[in-house]
Curated annotation (Swiss-Prot):
It comes from Anoxybacillus flavithermus (strain DSM 21510 / WK1). Its main location: membrane. The gene is mraY. It is a multi-pass membrane protein. Keywords: Cell cycle, Cell division, Cell membrane, Cell shape, Cell wall biogenesis/degradation, Magnesium, Membrane, Metal-binding, Peptidoglycan synthesis, Transferase, Transmembrane, Transmembrane helix. This is Phospho-N-acetylmuramoyl-pentapeptide-transferase. The chain crosses the membrane at residues 5-25, 55-75, 81-101, 122-142, 147-167, 176-196, 203-223, 227-247, 250-270, 302-322. NCBIfam families: mraY. InterPro entries: Glycosyl_transferase_4, PNAcMuramoyl-5peptid_Trfase, PNAcMuramoyl-5peptid_Trfase_CS. CDD domains: GT_MraY. Pathway: Cell wall biogenesis; peptidoglycan biosynthesis. PANTHER family: PHOSPHO-N-ACETYLMURAMOYL-PENTAPEPTIDE-TRANSFERASE, PHOSPHO-N-ACETYLMURAMOYL-PENTAPEPTIDE-TRANSFERASE HOMOLOG. The lineage of its organism: Bacteria, Bacillati, Bacillota, Bacilli, Bacillales.
Length: 324
């Protein structure tokens, strides 16, 4: 398999998303699947109220079609392909239910935290079942070192922690026009390079299919956004990148490649702990991207800055894995 296949895969996913979007967005608008904006959020966001959401369905459809076609044409589908699609679509479905409850049933909070956690745990456990069935490695290595540890049965705890925590971290990043789409494209691109370097072409194909799909979505999601991906897209992307990290045995490296997601999550944790213990907030608002908006940065400036930071993290991750 050569580089042309990778480029063709990304291009196909991009085109499918770009073609679907002008059809899908008006359909979402007619169904009145509009995003509700939190009153406590930045005032500049109130004008976004009613913007169609659940656009993550386009990403899911595009990456699924592309992965299925490309794996059918260029190599026999592997267990990795099925596991990646299962977790991604599973978390996407969970996000869709959450979006549907919020948008259609007009319950602002969507699924309760317990319901969402139960869904995330169920998908994680089913994934672990397949992981065990195919006797995959439970060894975890520290990037850039020769240090490794076989977790054995305890690896299931790592899978649960990564899938639940990772999907929520990616979800938190989806707060500004184009922010998650851009940072996700960069992170998945980094893992595509590393999967290709390992000879895991099935994982590389899936990764670049995601890159193409989210870049196609970014055409319509960049400021001012014509559509939001919703939890349908953000939870799916979170589940997908964690699964890729597990299958490539680069679990810990996700902390670096997904550095933006980690920072966003830490900002929320710090804010909550600080307010509960001292009654004071460290940031104007969390996640961190809203803090920068409230100190005067334009939305576009925040997004581009976070993209740049995400790119630096991705380059650092590739460097550590390939050259250190």
């Amino acid at each position: 398999m050569n580089e042309k296949v990778i480029l063709f895969t990304a291009g196909l996913a991009f085109i499918i998303t770009v073609v679907l979007s002008p059809i899908f967005i008006p359909f979402l608008r007619r169904l009145k699947f509009g995003q509700s904006i939190r009153e406590e959020g930045p005032k500049s966001h109130q004008k976004k109220s009613g913007t169609p959401t659940m656009g993550g369905l386009m990403i899911l459809l595009s990456l699924s079609i592309t992965t299925w076609l490309m794996s059918d044409i260029f190599f026999e589908r592997t267990a990795h392909t099925y596991m990646l699609l299962f977790v991604t679509v599973g978390y996407g479905l969970l996000g869709f239910i959450d979006d549907f409850i919020k948008v259609v049933m007009k319950r602002n909070l969507g699924l309760t935290s317990k319901q969402k956690l139960a869904g995330q745990l169920l998908i994680a456990l089913i994934f672990y079942f397949f992981f065990q069935h195919y006797s995959m490695s439970t060894v975890v290595s520290i990037p850039g070192t020769d240090v490794s540890l076989d977790l054995g049965v305890a690896y299931v705890l790592l899978i649960i922690f990564m899938l639940v925590g990772g999907s929520n971290a990616v979800n938190l990043t989806d707060g500004l026009d184009g922010l998650l789409a851009g940072t996700a494209a960069i992170a998945f691109g980094a893992y595509a390079v590393l999967a290709w370097n390992q000879g895991q072409y099935d994982v590389a194909i899936f990764s670049v299919a995601v890159v193409g799909a989210v870049l196609g979505f970014l055409v319509f999601n960049a400021h001012p956004a014509k559509v939001f991906m919703g939890d349908t897209g953000s939870l799916a992307l979170g589940g997908a990148i964690v699964t890729i990290a597990i299958l490539t045995k680069l679990e810990i490296l996700l902390v670096i490649i997904g550095g933006v997601f980690v920072i966003e999550t830490l900002s929320v944790i710090i804010q909550v702990i600080s307010f509960k213990t001292t009654g004071k907030r460290v940031f104007r608002m969390s996640p961190l991207h809203h803090h920068y908006e409230l100190i005067g940065w334009s939305e576009w400036r925040v997004v581009v800055t976070f993209w740049a930071v995400g790119l630096l993290f991705a380059i650092l991750g590739i460097y550590i894995e390939v050259w250190v």
